[in-house]
UniProtKB/Swiss-Prot annotation:
Signal peptide: none annotated. Gene3D superfamilies: Ribosomal protein L14. Keywords: Ribonucleoprotein, Ribosomal protein, RNA-binding, rRNA-binding. One of its GO terms (biological process) is translation. NCBIfam families: rplN_bact. Binds to 23S rRNA. Forms part of two intersubunit bridges in the 70S ribosome. This is Large ribosomal subunit protein uL14.
């Protein structure tokens, strides 16, 4: 469960290390985002020679949450932390590699590029 001001790890090689959620997209009253939701983020920590700089604002898709995601069969998948993948204006990933596992729910939300780049899909 991601809300405004939540700090997330970045699960790609775009150059950002930490991002902060500044808006949950999808309606004016929407408070929380889960796996597969698109959020607006600001880069808080970045690598020296990355594609993004500290202070830049991007869209990002949430790929892992500590809250977890409930499956229709009743199982629940939780992660140790919250992570996102930074997207460009066309909602395509900026990075060329994805680090760590991602959930199968991303496949339903038209993020097949992220699913195909990920080392493990749970």
């Amino acid at each position: 469960m991601i809300q405004m001001q939540t700090v997330l790890d970045v699960a790609d090689n775009s150059g950002a290390r930490k991002v902060q959620c500044i808006k949950v997209l999808g309606g004016s009253k929407r408070r929380y985002a889960s796996v597969g939701d698109v959020i607006k983020v600001a880069v808080k920590e970045a690598a020296p020679r990355g594609k993004v700089k500290k202070g830049d604002v991007f869209d990002a898709v949430v790929v892992r949450t500590a809250q977890g995601v409930r499956r229709p069969d009743g199982s629940k998948i939780k992660f140790d932390g919250n992570a996102a993948v930074i997207l460009n204006t066309k909602l395509e990933p900026i990075g060329t590699r994805i680090f760590g596992p991602v959930t199968r729910e991303l496949r339903n939300d038209k993020f097949m590029k992220i699913v195909s780049l990920a080392p493990e899909v749970l």
